[in-house]
């Protein structure tokens, strides 16, 4: 009788991955323009239960601070359609917001929070994933109860 195999505990690969090696990053700003391709947008649409994701892009600036924390700033935008919670019709939306995230290595994991920003996100193997960070920001910005324009409020 074969032994049951242990579950693979690795994280699934993100649908939209844009890795940035911050371990070799100096103090100079690193500018990054990222845009999801059609395959990535389709996978993200499935993940976030969207009818469609026509565009997801970001213009980012990464800078390592004196304390070793990497600050990511910029702006993201998306063109998408969610399903109306009443009629199930597509509800188009354009979303976007400023980005201000902080990433710190294992040495910073037990550090105090960064003023008003909270704790920095972890850096794994000296790399951060700018695409996944922006995808998560979009996910948080989605309307939890989208309604078609002609549907009255409850």
What are these regions (language model features)?
Residues 2-154:
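Acidic and generally charged, gly/proline-rich low-complexity regions
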């Amino acid at each position: 009788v074969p032994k049951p195999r242990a579950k693979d505990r690795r994280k699934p690969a993100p649908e939209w991955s844009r890795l940035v090696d911050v371990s070799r990053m100096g103090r100079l700003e690193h500018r990054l323009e990222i845009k999801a391709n059609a395959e990535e947008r389709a996978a993200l649409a499935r993940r976030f239960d969207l009818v469609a994701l026509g565009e997801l892009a970001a213009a980012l600036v990464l800078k390592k601070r004196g304390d070793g924390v990497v600050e990511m700033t910029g702006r993201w935008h998306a063109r998408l359609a969610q399903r109306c919670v009443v009629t199930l019709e597509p509800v188009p939306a354009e979303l976007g917001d400023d980005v201000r995230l902080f990433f710190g290595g294992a040495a910073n994991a037990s550090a105090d929070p960064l003023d008003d920003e909270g704790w920095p996100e972890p850096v794994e193997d000296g790399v951060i994933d700018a695409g996944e960070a922006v995808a998560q920001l979009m996910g948080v910005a989605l309307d939890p109860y989208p309604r078609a324009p002609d549907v009255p409020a409850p």
